[in-house]
Curated annotation (Swiss-Prot):
Active site, UniProt feature: 279
Keywords: Aspartyl protease, Cytoplasm, Hydrolase, Protease, Protein transport, Transport
Bias kind Polar residues: ranges: 393-404
Oligomer and partners: Binds ubiquitin and polyubiquitinated proteins.
EC number(s) per entry: 3.4.23.-
GO molecular function annotation: aspartic-type endopeptidase activity; polyubiquitin modification-dependent protein binding; proteasome regulatory particle binding; protein-macromolecule adaptor activity; SNARE binding; ubiquitin binding
Enzyme class name: hydrolase
Protein name as it appears in the record: DNA damage-inducible protein 1
Organism, as annotated: Eremothecium gossypii (strain ATCC 10895 / CBS 109.51 / FGSC 9923 / NRRL Y-1056) (Yeast)
Task performed by this protein: Probable aspartic protease. May be involved in the regulation of exocytosis. Acts as a linker between the 19S proteasome and polyubiquitinated proteins via UBA domain interactions with ubiquitin for their subsequent degradation. Required for S-phase checkpoint control.
Region feature (Disordered): 388-410
Family that this chain belongs to: Belongs to the DDI1 family.
Amino acid sequence: MNVTVSNEVTDELLGPFELSDDITLMDFMALIDFDENEQALWHNMRQLKSVDREKTLMQLGIVGESLVVVKAIKKKATEGSTTRASKASAKAAKAAAKAAAVARDTPAEQATTVSPVAQVPVAVSPAVTAAVPTQPTSPSGGPAAANDIITPEDEYIETFRKSLLNSPSLASNIPIPGVNQLIQDSQLFKQLIGPVLLHRRAQQQAANQMGTAQSEYVKLMSNPDDPSNQARISELINQQEIDEQLHKAMEYTPEVFASVNMLYINMEINGHPVKAFVDSGAQSTIMSTALAERTGLGRLVDKRFRGIARGVGKGEIIGRVHAAQVKIETQFIPCSFIVLDTNVDLLLGLDMLRRYQACVDLKENVLKIAGIVTPFLPEAEIPKHFDMDPSAEATNLPSTSPLGNQKAAPEARDAGVGSALLNRSTPATAERTHAEEDVRRLMDLGFSRAEVLKALDHSQGNAEYAAAFLFQ
């Protein structure tokens, strides 16, 4: 909290002091060199008594940006007080004469013109308070007549105005042209500055440590042991921690809120340039049906390998291209593809990355594969169809690959092949039986019986295809 002290005895403005929430009133008194016998502390039109010296400032309602006023303790009229009163009267008369002179020299249109009230600094206006006047005063500043109605709001505004009159240093903190003349006129001060003061005070009174409305805070604190109140308090505390984390992240690591470009490389298939998406989270390398037709590989799709690609959603596998030459930079390498009806031309999956011992070097922004190095494409060259629709991005489940908009099945529009488990089995039919000799021969290669039977099911009993499947 930041506390400013206005000492009306010495006409000084101290602070603001940056204090912890657990500082006691006694420690605060010692900090400002407070004399209990001669002075009194006031905050929000309430005197801070010495009996509360063990309480913290927060318990006494002093939070955020606050002002504490030090006033002299009133004693019986003495010669000294009479002298001070005469000096104050002379000072007020002099100020009034000066204001009148300024008013005479100022055109009528400018006499009541003041800078916008919103310019009152937040550091001063939210919590500037003072003591209650010794007797009710009228808006004009004199004793109240019997038919005058003095509201607490009027008292608050008038007390603030008098604090500025008694503390020129405090008034100098308000960057309004002609403020010294403004505080001489109680009616004009109330009209222009009053609404801002009342609004700031209402904001301060509504604030609390839970960051919620004061009415809800009072309701929660009136019965904190109630299970529903405890749940709400816990929710508010958690929300405060979340907001704090958000603010820290935005201040110290704003880069985490930026979008990340996906990894694409250039390659060629049968002389056709292709932008391939590199996804180490995808189990298999995938080609779209459109690209298969463009590159002349559509006729080589083995539809016996039909199946379902399962991830966040699912999509239909059209078939498989067992081998095709792919050119990356100057290197030709054989590659196999799973063919899906998707809007992404080519996805370079983990099977090919592991096969050629690829290295995704994010520091150098390159892909090292098959003994060559190829750079990842800049953002401007990344296919635009990869970008998700903003409205869909908020509702779709997260996907680690771009295969989110598949046409094979309605569910496949949200499917992510990056986490997909590709089920290459053909549609369910009667359970097949395989030659025991083929099963034993494949098991001798180091695979379990279940893996061998699954591979034979995928290849429709072809032992050679099953062996190729097992070694992928």
